Each structure stands twice: as structure tokens, then as C-alpha cells.
Amino acid sequence: MAQHYKTIGLIGKPNHDGASATIQTLHKYLLANEYKVIVEVSVAQSLDIKKMKTGTLTDIGEQADLAIVIGGDGYMLGAARVLACFDIGVIGVNRGNLGFLTDLSPSEIIKPLEQILSGKSRSEQRFIIEAEVYRHGKLKSSNSAVNEAVLHAGKVASMIEFEVYIDGTFMFSQRSDGLIISTPTGSTAYSMSAGGPILTPNLNALSLVPMFPHTLTSRPIVVDGNSEIKLILANDNHENLQVSCDGHVILTVMPGDEVIIKKSECSIRLIHPLDHEYFNVLRNKLSWGNKLY
């Protein structure tokens, strides 16, 4: 088999029996076919493999040509945020629920993987976003998000008040439970559950989706993906405010703070099987109707 990739990184959810079994299968297969393999260190501890090379996500990003992530979309998001700034392809094996980002089935993995490893695959760039919190003009914290950045109160069902600016132009002020700023990748996640639009992955766009706004006229809006979105928190908000990045990373926000959300310079290079079709994924995952005839 011709080798399109030379070094493969294996990443999986630690202490997950299904993920561990898949990683052990892949590790054995890849070594037998003379690939170099790096196993992410946190999952390596739960594997029954005597000799293996291990490394952090950063090590895999720096040394590998392809990363195979075994888990659900949530674990894929965590790995992708780190790997986005490296020149590495990423493909997922679904060990979760819906699996919008994880193409391969663990029960039928070797045949499609052979095709991918020989270069018979599709490559797709997905942009990510950066969220930055400023206090009195100084950067206090920042992080990236593959799916969405969400401004919200720290406690459930608590309204907050803020202003929204697009490229420095005032758009609106709002009292609501928060605001979701979603990428096209995230448009089938939290944003969709909140009534936001589905954006096809090739769009250079961001959607702003209000969370339970205290008005009947507030609706989601789609803006250019190169826009800089600025949220200014009202001074009379309660102190317990947050920005969540993909639901994993929490940035603390105080009344009067400014939150800047914009496209990152990094992007994810997703690798898909040749027969991958985005609308087919939507149809299967969301139980849409098939062709009539």
C-alpha cells in the first residue's frame, strides 16, 4: 500500500473501553504496515500495549502527518482546538452519539482507513474563532473555539444585558440569557438547538443566536466570517458572567468588560472518505426525509 502519510497520531478518550479497543486495533494495524505511530499520552496509560511512542497533543501536531481522533464530537473538538495551528490532517472515529465530525465507524474502520492512508480522500478546511476578554482596555483571557463561543450568566436562567457591535458599528442591545456566536461547523450543535440556522461548511460566515431574549422580535442573524464581533457588558450585570468556548473552556467576564470574537488565523484540516457528502450526513444524523423516487 502506497503511503500518503508517514507518521500517525492516535488520540482517544481516556478510560473509555470502546475508544481503547479501537486505538489498540489501529496501533497494531499501523505498525504492521510500517507507519510511525504516536499515541496521545493521556489515553496511553489505559492501553494494554507494551511498547509504544507517546506524546502530547502538541507533540502529535508537530510530528505527525495525520491525527486519528477516537471518541465523540466533544472529544474531537478538544483535540481540534489544539491541532488547528499545526499542518496536520484530522479524521475522527465515532465513539459518541451523533458524530457530525467523526466520519468513520469503529466496526468498519480498516477498509476506509486504507483508502485514506493511500491518499484517496477529501480534505476540507474549517475555520475556528478566537474569544478575547478585555477589562479596562487590557486583555485578561482568551481561547479558541471550533463550534461556538457563548456569552452567558454563570447560573441557570439568569438574564444579562449587553451591547453588540459588528466591525465597530453598533447593532443592538439585548436582555437575554446570553448570545451564541457560531461557526459553520458549530451550526449543527448548540446553535441549532437554540433555533439558529444551519450553515454549510464552505461558507465564510458567523451566526449570532440570542438565548431566550426578552423580546419577540430578536432573531438569529448571519454576518460575514471576517467580521469582528464586540460584546460590551452592562455595568449593572451580576458579577458571575462567562464566555464558554465549545462548552469546554470557561473565560470569566465581569460587568463592563468587552468580549471580542473573531476568526482565528488557525484552521482545521479535516480528512474525509471519498464518499463523504455533507448533506448525506445531515440527512442521516437529523433524520431528514430521503428522496421520494
From Swiss-Prot:
Gene Ontology terms, MF aspect: ATP binding; metal ion binding; NAD binding; NAD+ kinase activity
Binding site for NAD(+): D73, G74, N147, E148, R175, D177, T188, A189, Y190, S191, M192, S193
InterPro entries in alphabetical order: ATP-NAD_kinase_N, ATP-NAD_kinase_PpnK-typ_C, NAD/diacylglycerol_kinase_sf, NADK
Catalytic activity: NAD(+) + ATP = ADP + NADP(+) + H(+)
Residues of the active site: D73 (proton acceptor)
EC identifiers of the protein: 2.7.1.23
Reported cofactor(s): a divalent metal cation
Pfam families: NAD_kinase, NAD_kinase_C
First-listed, main subcellular location of the protein, grouped into a coarse class: cytoplasm
Keyword Isomerase attributed: no
Keyword set, alphabetical order: ATP-binding, Cytoplasm, Kinase, NAD, NADP, Nucleotide-binding, Transferase
Cysteine pairings via disulfide bonds: none
Localisation: Cytoplasm
GO cellular component terms given for this protein: cytoplasm
Stored PANTHER family: NAD KINASE
NCBIfam families: PRK01231.1, PRK03378.1
Family: Belongs to the NAD kinase family.
Function field: Involved in the regulation of the intracellular balance of NAD and NADP, and is a key enzyme in the biosynthesis of NADP. Catalyzes specifically the phosphorylation on 2'-hydroxyl of the adenosine moiety of NAD to yield NADP.
Protein name, UniProt field: NAD kinase
UniProt source species: Colwellia psychrerythraea (strain 34H / ATCC BAA-681)
